């Protein structure tokens, strides 16, 4: 059994921002076409587990899972999976569903990545640790810590 785990399909340029997290819809479609063209049987994850226990799993079986539940999953991945007739399992980040909010650290990192600003001065808010950030990742980590300290 091969379990293929995906995250999100880009709505815009997210595949450039985090290529390990987002791919283009075309890349996802190409992968599904490859699976179909090669004749790999695609089974749902529950069916795969059941068939493993019963020693009845088809040879070269593939299960497809998608993590996080980004909008691109609904817009691009779900229709492509339906078109190919492939079952899949979606794992939702339930914390963010319950809070009805974005995955803050990823959203913030994307905004910083898209920004053309070279420096951000938060000294008026009493925070100076952004000035010492040596990289974008350090700046995002610092901003997340600031935001988390403001949660009430």
Where do the protein language model's features map onto the residues?
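A short alpha/beta connector and helix-capping loop motif
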Residues: 76-94
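Short, solvent-exposed loop/turn segments at secondary-structure junctions
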Residues: 8-12, 48-50, 69-71, 95-98
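"…centered on the first transmembrane helix and the immediately adjacent amphipathic helix/loop
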Residues: 1-21
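Conserved, mostly hydrophobic/aromatic
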Residues: 4, 35, 67, 81, ...
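C-terminal domain-boundary segment and adjacent tail
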Residues: 20-56
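Extended, charge-rich helix/loop segments that form flexible
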Residues: 1, 100-152
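Structural preference for beta-strand elements that scaffold enzyme active sites
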Residues: 3, 61-63, 87-89
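Membrane-embedded segments
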Residues: 61, 65, 71-77
């Amino acid at each position: 059994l091969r379990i293929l785990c995906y995250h999100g399909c880009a709505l815009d340029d997210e595949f450039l921002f985090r290529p390990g997290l987002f791919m283009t819809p075309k890349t996802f479609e190409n992968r599904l076409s490859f699976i179909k063209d090669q004749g790999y049987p695609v089974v749902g994850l529950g069916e795969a587990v059941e068939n493993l226990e019963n020693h009845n799993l088809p040879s070269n079986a593939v299960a497809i899972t998608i993590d996080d539940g980004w909008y691109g999953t609904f817009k691009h991945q779900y229709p492509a999976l339906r078109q190919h007739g492939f079952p899949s399992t979606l794992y939702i980040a339930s914390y963010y569903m319950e809070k009805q909010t974005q995955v803050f650290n990823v959203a913030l990192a994307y905004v910083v990545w898209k920004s053309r600003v070279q420096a951000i001065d938060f000294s008026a808010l009493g925070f100076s640790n952004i000035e010492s950030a040596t990289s974008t990742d350090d700046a995002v980590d610092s901003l997340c810590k600031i935001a988390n300290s403001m949660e009430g």
